[in-house]
Amino acid sequence: MPFYRRTVVPQRLCPRNPPQPLAELRDVSHLAALSLLRQLADLCGHSLALLEDLEGHLLALGRRTDSLYRRTVRLRRRLPCRLLGPEDDEELLAAANSGRENATATAHSRSSWRQPVNVFLSSGRPPSVEELLREAQLNLQSLLQEEYEEQYSEARLLGQTFRSSDGAPEPTPSPRPQSAKRLEFVLMPAKRQLSEDETTTQGVRAPEACLSLSTANKQSAWNDPFPLPILKERLWLQPCSTQSDLVPINISGQQFDRHASFRHSLFNTETAVNPKSTLRRRRTIIGFSNFSQRDQGHSSSPTGSLARSATSDIRPGHSAPQVVQGRVAVGQEARFPSLTSPGLRHSSSEPGDAHQARSASDHPGMESMAVVYSVPSSCNGPTESTFSTSWKGDAFTYMTPSASSQGNQVSENGKNPSSGNSWVPLNTLPPLVPKEAATLFVTRDNPAGCTGLPSYSEHPTLRRQIPERPPKIGLLARGTSRLETGPGGTNRFRERSLSVPTDSGVTSVDYDEEQKTSETRILPYASTSSEGSNSTDNIAALSTEQEARHRRQRSKSISLKKAKKKPSPPMRSVSLVKDEPALPPEGELVLPKDQRPRSLCLSLEHQGHHPPHPDAQGHPAVPMLKDPGSTQFSHHWYLTDWKSGDTYQSLSSSSTATGTTVIECTQVQGSSESLASPSTSRATTPSQLSIEVEAREVASPGRPTGLMSPSSGYSSQSETPTPTVSMSLTLGHLPPPSASVRVRPVVPERKSSLPPTSPMEKICKSRLSFDLPLTSSTTLDLSGMSISIRSKTKVSRHHSDTNFGVKLAQKTSPNQPIMPMVTQSDLRSVRLRSVSKSEPEDDIESPDYIEEPGAEEVFTMPERKVKPPIAEKPPLARRPPSLVHRPPSLPGEYPLTSPTMAMASRSSIPHMKQLPQDSYTVLRKPKSPSFPGESTASSSLVLSPLASSSGAFFSGTQQPPQASVEDGGPKVRALPERIGLQSQEEAEKKMTKIPPPVPKKPSVLYLPLTSPVAQMDACMAEPRLPFSPIITLEEDGKCPSTGDDQKSPGKGVTSPLHTDTEKEAISPGRSVEPSAEEKSLISDKTAEWIAEEEDDVFVASRTTEDLFTVIHRSKRKLLGWKETGEGFTGSKPSSHSPVKNTADSPTGEAAAAPGPSSSACLDAGRNDDFKALLQKKGSKATPRTRPSAAELLKTTNPLARRIIAQFSKDYEPTDNPST
């Protein structure tokens, strides 16, 4: 359209004098009037231009019409027979003549309107006009029907499925015969309606429509694809509920033909004829969505023919029951291709990501998925629902996506609807159906009674067919509330309500079948869920590889169903997803809550290595979970539960009431919820990722090993089985070889449940992901440390993920991944806490442990710099594992003791200070012997050239610290190769968890003096080496405590280096004396802790007794009963001989280092702390401890609170003296 070009210049219109201020109202009015006039002038110009344009068009049209008319006249003359009557002909001829004569006459004079033929008469109607009329009629009918349907749906939720828009139902004699030919149900594709000549198919000409519907000719038209008409029809009908393609039986008895064509759905012609019989009998309606068919890319005609054939099969019984059976047969056997229409999968109503993820592979199956809705009253769904209003929402009691989301998991009894299904709005479901073109089997009447419903029993067969995805008719034979979808359907539902899966109380119906069909979906979903945010990427990544795994896992998953599990809010599915990327969304959904294993499923990744874990679970479910298929879903769903909400809250809601256990499980499943989804973004640490992948393949199949013990109860030590699992999985996860045996390190799991541990674990995980490569992680696998980190991370994920995880992750995350490597960040993050408080008790129990603390100290040292205050608590829980482990590792541990002795010699910290490297070397050598014992994993980790054994163990990171730090550092590091890495990680975690006031600082301080250069060298060996100095510092801290006595002076002396190294670790105030005593404690604790983790890794069995022992020991330590004993017992005293021994006896040394108050404070603080913890005084005992993580844990978890308080006080006293 030509745009008017304004040529008038405003200044010319209203020439202005020099602008003057508008002083008067009239001036303003004048200006306004002028502007208005200008605008009007513009408008007039535009209108004039438009008019001119129109005039030109009209003239051109007139000329064209004239020429066309003349041509038509000439043509007629040439035709042998006149199309028009004589009069018309004469008129036309005359007009043509006149046109020729007046060729220049205006177009209007000769406009085509003068044509004698009446276009609207049937006789003279051209095909184009015919089509237009038909379309108009269809639109009108669709509008009318929509109105009627709404009325019916609102007024008649009852049985009237059809809301007939027009006149009374007409007996359609012809349709009946045709229905006899075809099935009773006539599927009217949209294309057919459009294609049908009778525009009245929609019901404008009801009789004709009926005839056309039933007529064979019409059928042929129907079969023929009419792409354009179909599209048009879609457009017209979409507004209508008919679009849902579920054709409710016309109960009202109104013309079914019109309805059928309108709805493009199968309907019983007989029903239309005999509304009563159909209303009574036929409750099941099979609707095929034409749109779905189109979406599928199946030509409408094939779908139509398929539907027709199916219908014909069904046709045998006019009575509703027979019809139902026939339909069932159709759905199961035929599974109309249209049901598998892509449209269903494409339906965005479902979680789009899940669908997309498996659209390619699952596409047929999903589309096939037939949603079986049991409609109690009527097939009418809510108007808003995708189902046409005909399925008024109230009518559907069917389990919606939430139940479906599990797929077959939907409970037959409708439990799902209440728990999981209720989550999915009915509206969500309807979109599913139309898009899926799923045959919507609504068993409305007495689905259970209907023989068609037996199809449910048949359904498994269908499910088995599901691999063929096309027959996706998930007929829910149970019908009433049971919504069962074909595998694809289940998956789709699963997709639809990812959060629901945990909730569904459905018993797995044909779980194996469903799993087979859903495996692929499970993988994508799991991946999505594992992501925490449903990420299509994860799904895509995992789908291929994990699909097979998920298939077998899924089948196992069935046995895992945990009916009693309390469904957590949907959010947990997201969290869970993080852990097991492959399983979470789909897998979770796959297992309804009912189906979930009673015991939480730990990832079989872990479980694979720890077969005994089932005992930890106390559930045969664990073995089942071992099945690759079952585990993923089950643990994912439970993970979702746990992770979705507060750790403890999730625990309460989760099947295992055990808060600790639940937390453990969650973390075990994915140490850092990323374990399960290594490929997904969830995997935070490369090592975890690789291990997780492996675990996913191996262990994931079963429910996570110790994840959730059905016996819940943070307090209940029986929970230890879960801890065992988490430790085994966590620790064993990384070291598959050694961890494989340790199925159930009970205590570690327990510890991981403790908030302190979890923060550290978290940190470890984060570090692994950030700083360390996957390879390092593999190295870690060899050592128990990696495992410890993982379990801790898992634990921390729930308990202190936010609080400790962030801080620790920042501090320790680089360290943790490569336990051997100690980076400066590690050193900073590592906080030497008086682990010995808690751990010395363990040590007291066995000299090994005490010695181990030396090793642990080394490990802790790298981590001591981490400030998370809560780190120590988990060590307590883990200590029993370390005890268990220690005896086996005594040779290694004793070398540690030797190193501890070396550390004791180190107690001549003065020389150590003077010759830090020399001392370090000496200590390193002692560790070297001990290291060989424990150096198996360590050697694989050999990174730094410093200590041959110890260095190897610590892969240079520890070694450099050992060399650079005091011998104690290498000793400790070298000592616990398993424990080394593991305990280092744990120490780091502890350090992070433990409040800043930790004796570790002195060691760090001392370390810097000794090994700034060595440290640098070590750092050269590995990124972690900077931390290794801190690790060494731990030992050093013991040494400095002793030799340095630097309590504060040591701090002061070491302060420069300490500030450099320990700055990272924490403030110099952490300081020598706390470093010595607390370090010994922490070292002990860490060593024990690590040993425990190692033990978990190596020694599968941890019992509640161990856990209790650890707890009691920690209590004793807190009370100070065994503080000295622990210190005496060895590794601490040996390692920190002056400080530790004096401060274990040590207290003296601790006092010496930080002043008598250090040791005394530790003992007294421990007693006070323990008492306070018992009285909840100690929960905030350590202000220096990070309240955010530790205190949160305290508040959240009584046990964690106690442990945190213990550690806090332990460190606080030391801290205060040091400070």
Curated annotation (Swiss-Prot):
Alphabetical keyword list: Phosphoprotein
Biased composition (Polar residues): 288-312, 526-545, 708-729, 897-908, 1131-1144
Entries under InterPro entries matching the protein: NHS-like (IPR024845)
Biased amino acid composition, Basic and acidic residues: 352-364, 1076-1087
Disordered: annotated segments: 162-181, 288-321, 336-364, 400-423, 474-591, 669-741, 854-938, 979-1003, 1033-1087, 1121-1197
PANTHER family associated with the record: NANCE-HORAN SYNDROME PROTEIN (PTHR23039), NHS-LIKE PROTEIN 2 (PTHR23039:SF2)
Compositional bias per record (Low complexity), positions renumbered to this chain: 674-687, 1145-1160
Recorded family membership: Belongs to the NHS family.
Phosphoserine carried by residues: 499, 575, 690, 1048, 1208
Basic residues bias spans: 549-567
Species the sequence originates in: Mus musculus
Disulfide bonds: none
Protein name per its UniProtKB record: NHS-like protein 2
